[in-house]
Amino acid sequence: MSAPPENLMTESRNPASSHIDTLSTLEMLKVMNAEDKKVALAVELALPSITQAVDLISAAFHKKGRLIYCGAGTSGRLGILDASECPPTFGTPAKQVMALIAGGHRAILKAVENAEDNLQAGQSDLQNINFNENDILVGIAASGSTPYVIGAMRYAKSINAQVIAINCNPNSLMSKECDVNICAVVGPEVLTGSSRLKAGTAQKLILNMLTTGAMIRTGKVFGNLMVDVQATNAKLVERQKMIVIAATDCLREEAEKALLQCNGHCKTAIVMILTNTNTAQAKSLLAKNNGYIRQSIVK
């Protein structure tokens, strides 16, 4: 199933680092830094595909669908990292953005032998979370040929769910199994085949864009403020106050009072202040406008 390593750009040798073991520490790091600078440019070239993906994910969220990441090794762990940040950052339900990794939970901290080579496991893991046609799958694999991920993608397509691929090799196997193919061609790694480096960095940048873009599109952001942030610790309690102040240009005391009245619901506090309404009225305005602050404050 997997493409031979010699045919993959991510597995080829990088001439810029062919003698990296002979360099001073500073020169070694300069080589790495020079290669890392190429990553953002590679992601920039993929922006049209990333745009399509964000719009698909936003549409899925509007239909109460879930975003499911699927990957193996570094790719799987990056999916877990991004998914786990969504509830505290955007106030999403725990299962709105989920991540699957080949080998299951134990593979997060330790490599599980041959887990990524199991084509059927990808399908089984999706079935175990009741993946359906309203959900959207994002397969992540630097090589673009990981059997576990391809198995999941094929199952998702078989039930008419939409599928996005994130990879770093042109014309990969994954590109033939998806609706949108995001290919960030970062080139050979500084350490041959170590796709946790440039490929992993590119994947993280893309995942940042997917969730952040989709959350903006679904009303989780006002201006550039995280208005659905959950106050789960002292730092975030303070951040909520600063968000309300920034959004409304009110005094600190007014922000604290509004947040207290609406039990720490940032959006409600902002709408209360900007529309001069009480908690119930502000909540009603938000409900009528699907949680979008900007529409809720239009007079």
UniProtKB/Swiss-Prot annotation:
The name this protein carries in UniProt is N-acetylmuramic acid 6-phosphate etherase
User: Sorted alphabetically, which PANTHER family does this protein's record hold?
Assistant: GLUCOKINASE REGULATORY PROTEIN
The biological process GO terms on file are: 1,6-anhydro-N-acetyl-beta-muramic acid catabolic process; amino sugar catabolic process; N-acetylmuramic acid catabolic process; peptidoglycan turnover
Q: Name one GO molecular function term.
A: carbon-oxygen lyase activity
* SUPFAM superfamilies linked: SIS domain
InterPro entries registered for this protein in UniProt: Etherase_MurQ, Glucokinase_regulatory_CS, MURQ/GCKR, SIS_dom, SIS_dom_sf
Q: List its EC numbers.
A: 4.2.1.126
Similarity section:
Belongs to the GCKR-like family. MurNAc-6-P etherase subfamily.
Instruction: Supply any other comment.
Output: A lyase-type mechanism (elimination/hydration) is suggested for the cleavage of the lactyl ether bond of MurNAc 6-phosphate, with the formation of an alpha,beta-unsaturated aldehyde intermediate with (E)-stereochemistry, followed by the syn addition of water to give product.
Q: In which pathway does it act?
A: Amino-sugar metabolism; 1,6-anhydro-N-acetylmuramate degradation; Amino-sugar metabolism; N-acetylmuramate degradation; Cell wall biogenesis; peptidoglycan recycling
List the active-site residues.
85 (proton donor), 116
Q: Which gene encodes it?
A: murQ
Keywords, ordered alphabetically:
Carbohydrate metabolism, Lyase
Which residue numbers delimit the SIS domain? 57-220
Reported function: Specifically catalyzes the cleavage of the D-lactyl ether substituent of MurNAc 6-phosphate, producing GlcNAc 6-phosphate and D-lactate. Together with AnmK, is also required for the utilization of anhydro-N-acetylmuramic acid (anhMurNAc) either imported from the medium or derived from its own cell wall murein, and thus plays a role in cell wall recycling.
Q: Which reaction does it catalyse?
A: N-acetyl-D-muramate 6-phosphate + H2O = N-acetyl-D-glucosamine 6-phosphate + (R)-lactate
Indicate the enzyme's highest-level EC class.
Answer: lyase
Q: How does it assemble?
A: Homodimer.
